[in-house]
Amino acid sequence: MRLLMRFMKPYRRLVAVTLLVLLIDNVGTLLVPTMLANMVNTGITTGDVDYILRNGLYMLIATGMASGGAVLGCYLAARLAANVACDIRNAVYDKSLELSASDFERFGTGSMITRSLNDINVIQQAILQTIQLVLPVPFLAVAGIIFAWLIDPAMGMLLGVVVAIVLVAAVFTVANAAPIFMRLQSFIDRMNVVLRENIVGVRVIRAFNKERREEQRLDEVFSDYAANAIKVNHLFVGLDSSTFFLMNIAEVAVLWVGGNRVGAHAMQIASISAVLEYALLILFFVMMAQMVVLTLPRAAACLNRAQQVLEIKPSIVDGQRTLDAAASDSKDGADAVAVFDHMSFRFDDADEDTLCDLSFACRRGQTTAIVGSTGSGKSTVAKLLLRFHDATRGAIRLDGVDLRELSQGEIRGRIAYVPQKAWLFSGTVASNLRFGNEDATEADMLHALQVAQSTFVLDQPQGLDTPVAQGGTNFSGGQRQRLAIARALMKRADLYIFDDSFSALDFKTDAALRHALQDETRDAAVLIIAQRISTILHADQIVVLKDGEVVGLGTHGELMETCEVYRAIAESQMKGGE
């Protein structure tokens, strides 16, 4: 609730106006039955036409208040709910960008999607329905009973008893429903995770002929959700039937007691209809409020899940230092852009170091390559440079400053990164290239495409405006890699990181691309993480990793003579035709 108040605080004025409009709506609604009873009892019974016309005008005004207030109140409530939900969603998204990789893994991709979309939609609907259907209940109940009491005290007491019984039933139902709704939300999380895995991995599932197995897995998850949803529906059905039953009982009781009161000349016959309208109005709103309140535990769970994201303290905190612009502008070929100084790293849940005592430098104007077997920690080096994780021991320095003393934004502003899995965003080729430089001209983009050997784009009828599907699935693996490289080249960076970014290229394209990169990145440091020895033959220095440790450092020629691990990798690839 504290989180909700925080996000509603900027809309205090809108909240006040919305409540005022709803109050006008409710007052108008409550006045009409009494006015109608007075018109019948006084005007029609006595034949007083002036009274009828005057009271009819008042009824018209009250009806206008109720109708206008209902329409305007609905609009204002919807606007308030949408604004608050939008702010919460933006806050959750912004917070997710601050989380480190290990922080993000605590929630999981499927859960974060659910929290950002489904959960906040539930919160939005809860805010809207609470304003429209729950908040008016106390006022309508008290005012309705008072109006009925003014008509006839006995009828007012009867109405008070009926409302109390319905409210007790509602509280009992809601108390039993809360745990079920909490479980329902966890089942939605599970469904999202399993569905996402099946959609993303559909080709693997088909390749291994595991459709039946995944169908069973999905069926289990769906069955669990369905069983819980059926329990919820049983509650709603029971609530519906019991509420309608009580409404009918209340109607019979009002007519029976009212008939006796009329027979005893204690009240007039038209007053029965007014009391009956108050009873039905109050019970209707109580019934609707019950429906809404039943969903509030789920909304509270969703709000709590959003709060979990917003209140998590990121394990990686921005430092306060800034890089020296003069140092970063230096073009000295010996200038070390990034330095690993006896750096070791261990994942939070690991028993041993993933990387151990790494010491080497990436220098401006030089190419540093990292090679090693699968699982040796090559890609982790790139993630550490981007500060997706922090070093456990030792230090990594960028232009002489420890990464932990810098902001993540400043670090990543100096680095251009091509990930191991080339990912393109839905849109066009041009919109993807502008991820690297929003102000890029067409000439800049064409130059980057040429360097990245991506001129195939120009052969397309739409050129730079060629559509790109989500993930770039309308391009081949090699084309995606080259477009990702072109996107990185759009960014004039101090350090370019290519994480196995040439693996899908044929040898001719690989060689042409690396040759073009030499001129394009001559004023920057280049770090290439590769599996193929042919990709890094001409690197200025090659770092050989085995089980997270540096077992070789030098040029290709030096390592062939001094490093057994490197020589074994090179010879195995040569025998394999590489």
Stretch-by-stretch model annotation:
Residues 59-70, 163-167, 236-252, 256-257, ...:
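Hydrophobic alpha-helical segments in the permease module
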Residues 92, 96, 205, 306, ...:
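Helix-loop junctions and hydrophobic alpha-helical segments within the transmembrane domains
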Residues 110, 183-231:
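Loop segments that connect adjacent transmembrane helices in multi-pass transporters
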Residues 187, 191, 200, 206, ...:
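Cytosolic ends of transmembrane helices, especially the final helix of ABC transmembrane type-1 domains
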Residues 97-141:
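Juxtamembrane loop-to-helix connectors within ABC transporter transmembrane domains
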Residues 326-578:
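ABC-type nucleotide-binding domain
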Residues 10, 14-25, 129-184, 256-267:
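Transmembrane helices of ABC transporter permease
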Residues 1-32, 36, 44-59, 73-77, ...:
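Membrane-integrated ABC transporters
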